[in-house]
Amino acid sequence: MTNIRKTHPLLKIINHSFIDLPAPSNISAWWNFGSLLGLCLIIQILTGLFLAMHYTSDTSTAFSSVTHICRDVNNGWLIRYLHANGASMFFICLFTHVGRGIYYGSYLFLETWNIGIILLFAVMATAFMGYVLPWGQMSFWGATVITNLLSAIPYIGTTLVEWIWGGFSVDKATLTRFFAFHFILPFIVAALTMVHLLFLHETGSNNPSGLNSDADKIPFHPYYTVKDLLGVLMLLLFLLLLTLFSPDLLGDPDNYIPANPLNTPPHIKPEWYFLFAYAILRSIPNKLGGVLALVFSILILAAFPLLHMSHQRSLMFRPLSQCMFWILVADLFTLTWIGGQPVEHPFIIIGQLASILYFTIILVLMPVSSMIENRLLKW
């Protein structure tokens, strides 16, 4: 008798995706982050669901409802901080996952890569709207500053901003719609994740060498289920350590002050995972230019397949390109640091130089170093 998992219409899909899936025998721990992102999404949806049961999306009660969750709801403080720090873990996994894709040339799976970019935008939008919901000072002013950027769009900008706000400023209508979008987007992300996996399983996984691994495959279960389990336990350990020992480490103290439209905080800044893009935005004195740089700082990921000049897929055997990659990583850390600093000397010039370097490495230095490597190998 054939095993039910191989014949049942639903179980068959799960079987082909997570059990009998042929996987390369040499994929490293950098391939764990896909499953960790799935876990993060599940944690966020579950904690978010329980938070939504107690939250009210009204400007007069939003801040109080979050306080009520932390003080009066059974383990409400834990759910709230798991959700807030779960977002940080989500982005750590996201950035690592994208970095892995760049390092090992996984971007050559075009459909998978492009769906991944859409997923990145969707998760960033979700996180931004979630940050507005507690209705603290940084929530309110963050929402005001970021939505206001759309007014830089010629001709329709101002109308567009007022349409998103639902009025002439960030107010009750804005909070209500942000809550609605924040609730629905994770489910859209989950659906897109399935499409992401569907396209990945059309080609099979890449591997560190970047070579074809058809001749050497192993079943996903038990080898990679057990390997993923180790990643899961480590992620949960870090998340719980962060949540239980220093839950506010990555947050902003200003968000414990209720939103006040009459009082601007001295330094408006987003959560840490947006700081690199925020630094690029601030480094350009022109408003429209800044907005375009902000969008292209993420959208530039779509250019990676077009800029792939090397005859090898992975960076594993390409020391020059490896140097460029790690300079890019260091540059992103620099941008993240600058994004959290006030707009004054020397931070302005450091931010501008780091922004120029970011685009230069991706658009010029990485393709050029690939071509130099090709020449050195006489290809």
Swiss-Prot record:
Its cofactor is heme b. One of its GO terms (molecular function) is metal ion binding. Pfam families: Cytochrom_B_C (PF00032), Cytochrome_B (PF00033). Heme b b562 binds at residues 83, 182. Binds 2 heme b groups non-covalently. It is a multi-pass membrane protein. This is Cytochrome b. It comes from Chrysochloris asiatica (Cape golden mole). The lineage of its organism: Eukaryota, Metazoa, Chordata, Craniata, Vertebrata.
